[in-house]
From Swiss-Prot:
It is found in: Cytoplasm. GO terms for cellular component: cytoplasm. Residues 7-163 form the PPIase cyclophilin-type domain. It comes from the Eukaryota. GO terms for molecular function: cyclosporin A binding; peptidyl-prolyl cis-trans isomerase activity. This is Peptidyl-prolyl cis-trans isomerase A-like 4H. Glycans are attached at residues 71, 108.
Length: 164
């Protein structure tokens, strides 16, 4: 299986911040990687484009991917509402690791987070399935708009997304 590369064009209050590219680990985690890839391209009729990063905690992560509600209270995958944890072997080794948000075992949907630090306490609990390949500095810049209480000071949006 090919490890696809997707991109997110990020804006802050409508102003361009930059483009990040993300390599997906489809060779080891194919179902999760395919969900993310298809949500990035929009080929199933719904996508990440226009959704926001609603939760940012400096020194931890940036969370987004709720394209049905902008507040993180919903989740939808290309497989239906939720899908099972596929492979928990990848570790949360540091900044740029892409992982699934969940509400417990086997509750993956569309929400994701990008680590901004090593988060080993998430190993074995959240599916890590990709890594920022280029422009991790954009993710680090997003951190500046977050607070310890997870609120954001500005609207951080995925203005466009797709596959290279």
């Amino acid at each position: 299986m090919v490890n696809s590369v997707v991109f997110f064009d990020i804006t802050v209050d409508g102003k361009p911040l930059g483009r990040i590219s993300i390599k997906l680990f489809a060779d080891k985690i194919p179902k999760t990687a395919e969900n993310f890839r298809a949500l990035s391209t929009g080929e199933k009729g719904f996508r990440y484009k226009g959704s926001c990063f609603h939760r940012i905690i400096p020194g931890f992560m940036c969370q987004g991917g709720d394209f049905t509600r902008p507040n993180g209270t919903d989740d939808k995958s290309i497989y239906g509402e939720k899908f099972d944890d596929e492979n928990l072997i990848r570790k949360h080794t540091g900044s740029g690791i892409l992982s699934m948000v969940n509400a417990g075992p086997n509750t993956n949907g569309s929400q994701l987070f990008i680590c901004t630090a090593k988060t080993e306490w998430l190993d074995g609990k959240h599916v890590a399935f990709g890594k920022v390949k280029e422009r991790v500095n954009i993710v680090e810049a997003m951190e500046h708009f977050g607070y310890r209480n997870s609120k954001t000071s500005k609207k951080i949006t995925i203005a466009d997304c797709g596959q290279f």
